[in-house]
Each structure stands twice: as C-alpha cells, then as structure tokens.
Design a protein with these regions (language model features):
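Conserved P-loop NTPase
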Residues: 124-164
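Structural flexibility/helix-modulation signal
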Residues: 1-8, 15
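Conserved P-loop NTPase motor cores
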Residues: 10-131, 157
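Short, solvent-exposed loop/turn segments at the edges of secondary structure
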Residues: 2, 100-101, 135-137
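Conserved RecA-like P-loop NTPase ATPase core
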Residues: 7, 69, 142
C-alpha cells in the first residue's frame, strides 16, 4: 500500500474564490486529521504553498499546523517559490509565525524582490541576502536554529527518476 496521499488542486483555480476556499479548507482539515495519530510518524507537506496561502483562513490553519505538528510526531513541510505571498499584509503575522516556528529552513535562489520579502519573514544578514541572490541551481542556506549552513543539493539519477 502506498503510504502517501496527494491532492491535485489544479482544477480549483478555475473555481470561484468561495468554492476554492471551501475545498482548500476541507483538504487541509482532512489531511491534518490524518497527522494527529500519535502512534505513528507522519509528514504534512504543502508544495506550491504560495498558490493557496492567501485563500480564506488557509494561513491561520497552516500556522497552527506548523506550531502543533511536533506534538503529534509530525513533520510539516511548507514549500514555496514566492515568499511575497507569505509577506502579504493580509497574512504577514501567520507567515512570520510559520517561519519562526520552523525547526529547519532551506532557502534557495531568490531574485532581489523575493529576498526583500523573505527579510519580512525571517532575519537575514546582508551577506546572506547577497548570497541568496547569487545562488546557482542546488545551492542553499540551511537554517537550523541559530546556525546558518551553506549547502549544495545534488540529485542522483535514481532520485531524479523517482521525483520526475
């Protein structure tokens, strides 16, 4: 049996805002409910989070998931290419809380505007801001607590086949 459950949400984006918000709420609540089983480890992963963070109460829900996940043997992964949406004034408080509650952050290349938005969410030194703008594919900063570690992510052929 496949231990993964995935939801394709592409069709949601052709729906009205109200319907899209309701569907997103149902999926997030259902998914989070599966993560509350303390007898097993789980991962709650939201990819392309910038596409849904501004919908309805999504930011507040995801903030609570990030804050509470460790209590339930859960790791929460929120991935985005657009820190701008997390820094939007409508969700900035929740966006900051998600970043500040995260045990680990992996920051890859961003353009200047993306770096500026990221600094609204988490503290970066001038050197880190410059470095993030110059990263090549696979380069990143791993933030673990107060430690900042430059890393390079290499994908093997087997890994690429698995995710492609």
């Amino acid at each position: 049996a496949n231990p993964f459950i995935g939801f394709g949400t592409k069709v949601f984006f052709n729906q009205t805002e109200g319907l899209k918000d309701a569907l997103m709420h149902i999926i997030l609540q259902f998914s989070w409910g599966l993560c509350l089983d303390e007898s097993q480890y789980s991962v709650f992963c939201v990819d392309e989070a910038h596409l849904l963070i501004l919908a309805g109460e999504t930011a507040k829900m995801m903030e609570q998931f990030v804050r509470r996940s460790r209590k339930y043997k859960n790791a929460t992964i929120i991935a985005t290419q657009e820190p701008h949406d997390f820094a939007d004034s409508k969700v900035l408080t929740s966006g900051k809380a998600m970043f500040n509650s995260s045990t680990y952050k992996v920051i890859m290349h961003l353009e200047k505007d993306g770096v500026n938005d990221l600094t609204k969410l988490t503290k970066l030194t001038d050197g880190e801001r410059n470095l993030i703008g110059k990263f090549k594919m696979g380069d990143a900063i791993l933030i673990a607590g107060n430690r900042r570690i430059p890393i390079s992510i290499k994908v093997t052929d087997d890994m690429f086949k698995m995710i492609a």
